Regions:
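HAD-like aspartate-dependent phosphatase fold
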Residues: 1-120
């Protein structure tokens, strides 16, 4: 099985700047469903956050993941901030949708999941 790394803010949930407000982050459902599908398929998932490795942030993030059923094998903090990070783009990536409710690309994960299913 493969190893996958997911960013937290902007990928699994709306961005959060204050741990006191972390519980208000909206989940990006398609991304969470895709991540959970990968876990259930036996893949190793790391969630890597730009959030600081501070006890308050760690606890708030773990609670949020538990609340929304986000499955993962490893949770990391202090990810460097980068404007763009591209790695192993999915086939037909130009055919993604846009989730207007949370302002994030979300339907891309459905296309990726379809591509992964065709590799079997």
């Amino acid at each position: 099985m493969s190893n996958y790394v997911f960013a937290m803010d902007g990928v699994l949930c709306t961005p959060c700047d204050d741990f006191m407000e972390a519980h208000n982050c909206k989940p990006i459902i398609n991304a969470i469903e895709f991540l959970n599908w990968l876990v259930k398929e036996g893949h190793h998932i790391t969630v890597w956050c730009e959030r600081p490795n501070d006890l308050s942030w760690v606890m708030a993030t773990r609670e949020w993941c538990s609340k929304y059923g986000v499955l993962y094998n490893r949770l990391l903090f202090d990810k460097p901030k980068m404007p763009t990070f591209v790695n192993e783009t999915p086939c037909n990536a130009s055919n993604y949708g846009y989730d207007h409710d949370v302002g994030e690309v979300a339907l891309l994960f459905e296309e990726w999941k379809k591509c992964q299913n065709t590799k079997e």
